[in-house]
Regions:
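N-terminus-biased detector of the onset of the functional/mature region
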Residues: 1, 38-51, 65, 79-83
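Intrinsically disordered, low-complexity boundary segments flanking structured domains
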Residues: 1-2, 22-25, 66-68
Length: 83
């Protein structure tokens, strides 16, 4: 699963092979793993601590267009971390 970015111990990845809708990203934080919808950055599966969920959403919302483009074209592009 290609890594897009990482920040505060959270790794953001996108998986292109055999993916299924809705378009989403994977967030991994320690032993926790969750899927977030690219459209609205809502957690659609998995579990993350509440603080990590907020950080993923804060990071992902400004990059929704870039993430959707990656999903559509299956071309990975590294994105800057949350600061």
């Amino acid at each position: 699963m290609p890594e897009i970015t990482r920040f505060y111990g959270i790794v953001i990845k996108i998986f292109f092979q055999n993916e299924h809708n809705p378009p989403h990203i994977h967030a991994i934080y320690g032993e926790h793993n969750a899927l977030f919808s690219i459209k609205d950055m809502q957690m659609i599966e998995g579990d993350l601590p509440a603080r990590a969920v907020k950080l993923v959403q804060e990071w992902g919302r400004p990059f929704a267009k870039e993430l959707q483009q990656m999903w559509d074209t299956k071309e990975l592009k590294k994105l800057p971390p949350l600061k």
